[in-house]
């Protein structure tokens, strides 16, 4: 997932103020590890929180680069850890063709399949989000979805391949649905935040970055949607007969 969503999720889980990069127990480039406590009293559980930067979710075994993109190994650690795990993944902005995205998505799904998943494991794949040309000119959300649609063309979409993001998301939805019909079944879900994010030309970093958002802001709403999905899964586990 994007770093700003990782920050948002960490702050919701940990309930600690400040920048998570300054309080995490271990930091190695873009590998962040920390522990958060979920629940209270006798129900409290220590949960390990990890963030890996891997722009295309590759199954590399060593840290590597391709131009400006960084790839930190994550697959071995994910597969080897026997504890119940929630994997939250995202890919899109650093892939620039349909063929490359299909290949990367297929590789990611193979990596997920390597894990001997328990009934408590969960996988959530978050969709790519829309960029907004001339974001510095916006200070409030669009009032109607069509306002984004009328403005989504232009040089920024073409030069950064933002026009491919809806196609990437269709591929992701197809692969997640296929996996849900297989061995992993109902333990995988798509977190679709494209449409809701298209309403927000504002709140972005700006100054040349019209894709990423400031915090607090839009990524916090992605986190809220994630928590709704987790509550849905939790409710199903509670209702499941023993």
Show which residues each predicted segment covers.
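Extracellular glycan-modifying ectodomains
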Residues: 1-242
